[in-house]
Swiss-Prot record:
GO annotation, biological process: proteolysis
Membrane topology of this protein: Multi-pass membrane protein
Pfam families membership: Peptidase_M28, PFF1_C, PFF1_TM
Protein name per its UniProtKB record: Vacuolar membrane protease
Record keyword Membrane present: yes
Organism: Yarrowia lipolytica (strain CLIB 122 / E 150) (Yeast)
């Protein structure tokens, strides 16, 4: 039966109905209703698309929402305790370089001893070690991988380390370490970074003591100090004797300001599997890959612990990043629910770990994610790799085999339209839509680059809407002009090919880089390939005529839409005594077959396997792709504040995510009712206008800039140096009164960042200072820093002999200084000047036999070059190959103002093989040293003495106070260096 005879038969049936054939009318009415309701046409498809998109969009929003679940009545008592601790910890900024840092430490000690003195389980043993730990280490810059390798750090640590054990504890199993840092940055109150972690640890200790019996494993709590500037508290712990017995750790962190605490890194599957015990799981291994690939530049103590051989988890608050390290990271900006989310999950995971007999799978990275905040899914990366390899091998074979069977069937039947037709149209449509999507997103990028800091949804919706609309127009047009055998199936097959290639690349990346965030491609390929197999199988089990029948647009109004017949061949034909299953060769009924059998065959050809394909493809792929987009952009969308390259990367990611989410609907888009693309394009246009016309920042998503006041005692200058994105920074400075008197001098730092400096009033960092007769803007705090050269015995002056120089640094009310070096050829921080000539640094202490834990043969770190003389109290560090590029010094004793340093250098070390320079040989042998010391306190005013001898109160750092007071609500300030004030002085040795 050809197309025309079939049409004639159907029209004859309609005429019979009009003439009063009750039976025919009933059959036609039922068939039309079923086809209209369940067939592959615009009404049921549009309904399903709408319902699916709304429900899954809400699910993704709930999954990534910043709002944690509500607190239960059972959780309130412990949460209230933790909340009170958080309030006390975060009363003031408390960086390592501040007196408030000591206040927080004393509070932690007091709470630990208070908890230990209360009732607890029988046989509880609590050990507290608050002794000082000194380390002298040379490591790469934690936050800048491009920095020279010769960075030397002397650190005096005062961690509070607590070990909880019981009579049930099995020492052979190893301990579980809980770690958080109690220091903040100078510009922040440190609520989420990392007061919440400290409060959680205190609450976990309280909870553990309240149990009926003790833990199976010891629990060690490391309340560590100075994570913010080098992860040094964790470094100090790794030299503690208790570190040798740690089996696994949980590191608690914060890089946002509230919300939900996410598991974003895990060392391996063995420890990560214990996160399954979390009551409110929130996790994604995508972020782990972001750290590995360098997309996320910050670091946590997790890095130190894993490099030291420990296994564990990294859990942190992660958004909004714009408030991170600012005064908005305070108790008012977070919630009890946020703290409870970290607390409850930490208790659950800690209990699971302490009860474990062993931690297997140490060599297997973990792939993990939560679903809706209720279910935690985890697999070893090895399993994902094996499944991916099998899928890559089996998928194409199975799909290809079925494809060839369908093609042979169609060719043998002599059909004019085969499954080979129509492959080019979707390729053209996708290419055009990708270009259009890129154009729209890039237009938004150029039109208002930084609005993405405020919301990434506007460019994402604009790009996604563009992609869907362009494909709707083009694929609908192609379908109108020349319908093909099964456009839906052809697109599914093409997507299978593309996803197969992406999966192959992902497998290669997994094998070479242990990538844990690319499992999405495996899911997408399996889903799309399965839908393709269903479509091919449907063609095999139906008759050739009904499975390949093509209807043109002119027949859309006929009783039976033939084009829909081709798009939706049934998965399985209906069985009845009068309708046997068609043969593989597609034999059809004779011309004289009864009309009701013809109607039945047509109804069968309207099969509803499309709905199975839809429900298989759209919900899963949309949830996976949109969830991936939301997760990635949640973590990245505020990074454009840091550089232009970051902005470029974010908008490129938005374009890619728009396409990835959009392909979800690609096989079905040409059948949507017209109002859907109209709504889609309306959303895209609205989102574009909002993006272009709205201010880029708001009080909830402010522009973050950085401040430090630099005082050069040699030049007699005091400048406020502020760093931020170009144009934005200068706009903010227009609000600052001081810049009217002292115009900022701005220069580009490259990558869309500029630095401006202007004359700033002197800081008042020491109580009792006297004001200058010339006013606040005159005079420098010369009493803060002094550097005196101490004579040493002369050494040989041969071209490759060692030179020694000694000097003492006197820095009042100070805990940290940095030494940078320069010669005629070398300059610290400049990798192009070669290897540093400084080969040995000696630090003398005022207290002979200074306490501290030194490294031994059993240390996890091999501290090559560090030696200590217990009789003289000298620390020495030798670094002959790399040299010492710079030295960072820390000290805990506020009453001891001095650092006593001796340097040994070889001026010609780096000149080997180079011709001798002409000039003053004595000048070549000299070593220049710039001493820069930092001060970090600003909130409490200082008491000073004016010209008449009267006491007055002054802001400690007037320039920073002015910025905080006068900057617009859509901007906020963070520290640029270790402190808020840096005072420098230069000497030559």
């Amino acid at each position: 039966m050809d197309r025309q005879s079939l049409r004639t038969t159907l029209r004859a049936m309609d005429a019979s109905n009009e003439n009063g054939s009750a039976k025919g009318a009933k059959k036609t009415t039922i068939g039309s209703f079923v086809r209209w309701t369940f067939g592959f046409n615009s009404v049921p498809l549009t309904t399903l698309v709408t319902i699916t998109t709304v429900l899954l969009g809400l699910l993704v929003y709930v999954s990534t929402s910043v709002n944690p679940p509500d607190v239960t009545e059972a959780q309130k008592p412990l949460l209230n305790y933790a909340w009170a601790q958080l309030g006390e910890i975060s009363r003031y900024p408390h960086p390592y370089f501040s007196h408030d840092n000591d206040r927080v430490r004393q509070h932690i000690l007091k709470e630990v001893y208070t908890l230990a003195g209360r009732e607890h389980f029988e046989g509880a043993q609590i050990e507290v070690d608050d002794s000082q730990t000194d380390i002298f280490i040379q490591k790469e810059d934690v936050f800048d991988k491009s920095a020279p390798p010769g960075k030397l750090t002397y650190f005096e640590g005062n961690n509070v380390v607590v070990r909880l054990s019981s009579k049930n504890s099995d020492k052979s199993l190893g301990a579980i370490l809980l770690s958080a840092h109690f220091d903040s940055v100078p510009s922040s109150f440190g609520v989420t970074d990392d007061g919440a972690g400290i409060a959680t640890m205190l609450a976990v200790l309280k909870h553990a003591l309240a149990q009926n019996e003790g833990p199976k494993r010891d629990i060690i709590f490391n309340f560590n100090n100075n994570e913010e500037f080098g992860l040094l508290g964790a470094e100090a712990f790794m030299h503690h004797p208790w570190a040798q017995n740690v089996s696994a750790f949980i590191n608690l962190e914060g890089t946002g300001a509230g919300g939900k605490a996410i598991l974003f890194r895990a060392s391996d599957y063995g420890v990560a599997s214990h996160y399954s015990a979390a009551e409110m799981p929130f996790a994604s291994s995508v972020y782990q890959e972001g750290f590995s690939n360098g997309f996320i530049h910050s670091q946590t103590d997790y890095k130190v612990y894993t490099e030291g051989g420990l296994r564990g988890l990294d859990i942190a608050f992660y958004k909004p990043r714009a408030l991170y390290h600012t005064r908005r990271d305070n108790i008012a900006e977070t919630t009890k629910n946020a703290l409870n989310h970290m607390l409850v999950n930490t208790i659950d995971v800690t209990q699971s770990m302490t009860e474990a007999d062993s931690f297997d799978h140490a060599d297997q990275p973990a792939v993990f994610s939560d679903i809706g905040g209720y279910l935690f899914i985890i697999l070893p990366l090895q399993y994902i790799f094996v499944i991916s390899c099998l899928t890559l091998a089996v998928g194409p074979i199975f799909v290809g085999f079925l494809f060839l069977l369908v093609l042979r069937k169609q060719i043998n039947a002599g059909t004019s339209e085969t499954i080979l037709g129509g492959w080019l149209r979707s390729i053209v449509s996708v290419l055009v839509s990708v270009v259009a999507t890129y154009f729209v997103v890039e237009t938004l990028h150029l039109g208002n680059e930084l609005y993405v800091v405020r919301s990434f949804y506007t460019p994402l919706f604009a790009g996604l809407g563009t992609f869907i609309f362009v494909n709707y127009v083009l694929l609908g047009f192609f379908h109108f002009v020349r319908p093909v055998c099964d456009q839906k199936l052809i697109i599914l097959l093409e997507l299978s090919v593309v996803l197969w290639v992406l999966l192959l690349l992902s497998v290669i990346h997994e094998a070479t880089h242990k990538a844990t965030g690319e499992y999405h491609f495996l899911i997408l390929y399996i889903v799309v390939a399965t839908a393709s197999i269903l479509g091919l199988f449907g063609h095999l089990v139906t008759s050739t005529e009904t499975s390949t029948f093509v209807e043109g647009p002119e027949d859309e109004e006929d009783t039976v839409d033939a084009s829909e017949a081709t798009e939706t061949s049934p998965l399985l034909p209906e069985a009845s005594p009068d309708n046997a299953a068609p043969s593989i060769h597609g034999a059809v009924d004779p011309e004289n077959q009864q009309e009701d059998k013809t109607l039945q065959k047509i109804a069968v050809s309207m099969g509803y396997d499309w709905s199975i394909q839809f429900l298989l493809v759209v919900p899963i792929t949309f949830f996976v792709t949109f969830g991936l987009a939301a997760s990635l952009l949640d973590g990245l969308h505020q990074t454009p504040l840091e550089s232009e390259k970051s902005a470029d990367f974010v908008y490129t990611t938005i374009t890619a995510m728009s396409v990835l989410v959009g392909i979800t609907f690609l096989p079905f888009v040409h059948k949507l009712q017209v109002f859907v693309p109209i709504v889609v394009v309306g959303v895209a246009v609205t989102a574009s206008f909002v993006h272009i016309l709205s201010p880029p920042f708001s009080s909830n998503a402010p522009a973050k800039m950085r401040f430090v006041q630099n005082i050069n005692l040699d030049e007699g200058t005091s400048y406020a140096n502020v760093l931020g994105r170009q144009d934005v920074l200068q706009e903010v400075l227009e609000y600052i009164p001081s810049t009217d008197t002292f115009k900022p001098n701005c220069s580009s730092r490259g990558d869309g960042v500029e630095i401006c400096n202007y004359i700033a009033p002197r800081p008042w960092l020491i109580d009792g200072e006297k004001v200058s007769s010339d006013g606040d803007f005159a005079g420098l705090p010369t009493n803060l820093l002094d550097v005196k050269v101490v004579p040493v015995n002369e050494t040989s002056s041969g071209p490759f002999d060692r030179f020694d120089g000694r000097f003492k640094i006197s820095a009042l009310n100070n805990r940290g200084c940095v030494l940078r070096f320069n010669t005629t050829r070398f300059k610290s921080g400049d990798v192009e000047t070669g290897v540093s000539p400084v080969k040995m640094v000696t630090l003398r202490h005022n207290r002979v036999g200074k306490t501290g834990i030194t490294t031994g043969s059993g240390s996890r770190f091999s501290m090559f070059g560090w030696t200590r003389d217990p009789k003289t109290g000298k620390d020495e560090f030798r670094s002959f190959m790399h040299g010492v590029d710079d030295v960072t010094l820390h000290k805990l004793d506020w009453e001891d103002p001095e650092y006593d340093i001796q340097l040994s250098w070889i001026p010609r070390w780096y000149e080997v093989g180079d011709p001798e320079d002409e000039g003053n040989e004595a000048l070549k042998n000299r070593l220049g040293v710039t001493v820069t010391c930092s001060w970090a306190e600003y909130l409490d005013p200082s008491s000073i003495v004016d010209e008449q001898g009267r006491r007055r109160t002054m802001d400690k750092i007037p320039a920073f106070t002015e910025l905080n007071n006068f900057s617009p609500a859509w901007s906020i300030w963070s520290n640029q260096g270790r402190g808020l004030v840096e005072v420098s002085k230069y000497v030559e040795l």
